[in-house]
């Protein structure tokens, strides 16, 4: 075996270790033990690894590695989504860059799809390569692409079944329409952006000479205007859509318009008559209390139109130009050119009352940036009512559990307000809808054209053409939990372990897709298999930058996880952040901010430091602020672990141990007891998905208990003359280190594997990899008699800390020996001083330890207090008196602050009444200890 390198350099071993794991098949299911399955939310095949992926995949990998070490039969199902819209855009852009004049339209459907498959073969595995760099222990041999033959067959089967059950239908409804992509898109693909716009107030003339008494009042209720009007005033932010108005509505209880409920309006610019209707939807307090109704171009108006059976007039073409349903002079105009003409004509007619600035929430497509139109079109839909009712029952009955549980409320709200789901998209890349039409427009649904013809007795003379639309990607994604396990093919289901691995154990995902994906998987899995897709849904927060801002290309604040792992120069980072911007004018601002934040670029941290950072940040909150400084700190943590291992190896050279150590010293018993407790805490944190508490527990044990204290406290025994104690301490040093590496492995797999390969042989442990070793359990070591050791070592630590603080504040050189006088103290203190005298002398460079006799005057000395014991370091020849006075004043102030904190808690009636009695009593004991210390410090100060 090669010798451990002298310094921690993750780039020297991370890729090598991953290749070894994968080639050895360590990530494949074992086939034995209780199954533990995790579903990877399939990233877009077009995508690259971003911080959101890295965040969730780190937590998933930790869960998988942890359960693999506990003997579970682990399956981490991975794969990629075909990402219809995104993929078409990427391939279209690449065609343009090639400069051959080829476009989507010139190639035609078959030619374009062939180009997509070519691109997928060349670039489609980018994100999976990046996932390997992060350390994800997925079974890559089972990686699934949503357009593979088997999942494609599952999509067809699901569509046909739901159609035959009457759950899928074709109809005309309002959808989100992207006029650039010329397709419907989902709500998740729409970003509502606050922008400056205008609110126009327009006169709508009443028909048939109808008038009403219009009255206005000021804020105090005083009448300011009374006049007879033959028009209503309507406010709108989209005047061009008035050409498609089919009603004007008022609130039924609005007295101002009570006489107009049966009236009609002459719609300006068109001359059409539209009714005045009443509806509770109207907010009487907003504007004039009169609202135009355009059912074909507003989602709320559409619902009003359905309730009142209003006509739906679609004004737009697929590119958002005005169509033939508008007066002839508007036809063919872009929607915004039509707006200008409408406003101009209204002004000429004296119907434009007012124009004022107004803040708008503008819906824009997340890929094109174009304003999205509510658009009336023929689409395929899934009836959701019955599916949603059952999906809600499965969660509320506890068959699917949300963590944290408050997300059930969000789930319930969505499920109780669900609308039918538009599943068709006007694209070429994707699962084509298995529906065929004859020349009369009659629709036939089946698995393929041959089956359709056979089922319906259609001969070759009957011309059929398949629906040109494809299914939106969420349709195939909802089948992910069971389509990846071979459904609906019985042989594939058997081969891929359908009965064994469904339901999966946990889904780790973000709250933003609870409805779009989580809910749909619950409904679909129940509908098609009669099971739930997963037992737990762990909802993570969303990764934001250190200031809490959303990471986005347009803001220039995106952090690439691979740049954190491998490092990147400032020039490359600037180039990455400023290229391909939708708003190129932002490049200069982004470059300036980037150079300010990362003047020297980003150093390489390694995958383990990034992973541990992610775990430490994984609270149960809604947002996660990612601070690169934390990654630097955890790189130092990995380095500390590396150096502690080198210390252990140097001090056990040639040694060979086996089994559980039989401790000879209190120090060993203390660290073994701490190890036992930490193993139990770690398992509890995994069970509760508290990765933040897990990271904190392991960090404190590794850095503080093991690296700082045990290694230090073990040195006297390691260097002492008592051979049994030295050998036992060496055994314990290796034993605890090896267990610590196993505790840390799910979070930091690379460094722990590299170190374990060096440590394990000295303990007689066989095996190729730490990843298949048992995770530490409470009870691995019988620590039932170690309580006294824990108390003793906590006392010893307090003594060492107090004396080191004194030495530091007095600037006593580390090599200089000092004398220690002890005063007061309990019988336990005296016994412990006698028992640990050699360790105290070794660790603190003490030339002597003496007790002051009762009534003996203490020399001028620097003082520290540990419980009832006063520690005195004589100052003669050590420091000047002024410096010691300053030190004591600082220490007195520190203790006074602690007393203030205790008094604040104990003076808080809520704390005293509601906190557990043991906690309150502990606070009182702390107050007593601090008060005793303060008394002693003041006495020492008085002597100076």
Curated annotation (Swiss-Prot):
SUPFAM superfamilies: Anticodon-binding domain of a subclass of class I aminoacyl-tRNA synthetases, Nucleotidylyl transferase, tRNA-binding arm, ValRS/IleRS/LeuRS editing domain. Its EC number is 6.1.1.9. The keyword Ribosomal protein does not apply. Its main location: cytoplasm. A motif ('HIGH' region) lies at residues 43-53. It is found in: Cytoplasm. Keywords: Aminoacyl-tRNA synthetase, ATP-binding, Coiled coil, Cytoplasm, Ligase, Nucleotide-binding, Protein biosynthesis. It comes from the Bacteria. GO terms for molecular function: aminoacyl-tRNA deacylase activity; ATP binding; valine-tRNA ligase activity. The keyword Coiled coil applies. GO terms for biological process: valyl-tRNA aminoacylation. PROSITE patterns: AA_TRNA_LIGASE_I. ATP binds at residue 553. InterPro entries: aa-tRNA-synth_I_CS (IPR001412), aa-tRNA-synth_Ia (IPR002300), Anticodon_Ia_Val (IPR033705), M/V/L/I-tRNA-synth_anticd-bd (IPR013155), Rossmann-like_a/b/a_fold (IPR014729), tRNA-bd_arm (IPR010978), tRNAsynth_Ia_anticodon-bd (IPR009080), Val-tRNA_synth_C_sf (IPR037118). It holds the Pfam family Anticodon_1. It catalyses: tRNA(Val) + L-valine + ATP = L-valyl-tRNA(Val) + AMP + diphosphate. Residues 878-944 form a coiled coil. It is an enzyme of class 6 (ligase). Belongs to the class-I aminoacyl-tRNA synthetase family. ValS type 1 subfamily. Catalyzes the attachment of valine to tRNA(Val). As ValRS can inadvertently accommodate and process structurally similar amino acids such as threonine, to avoid such errors, it has a 'posttransfer' editing activity that hydrolyzes mischarged Thr-tRNA(Val) in a tRNA-dependent manner. Monomer. ValRS has two distinct active sites: one for aminoacylation and one for editing. The misactivated threonine is translocated from the active site to the editing site. This is Valine--tRNA ligase. It comes from Xanthomonas campestris pv. campestris (strain ATCC 33913 / DSM 3586 / NCPPB 528 / LMG 568 / P 25).
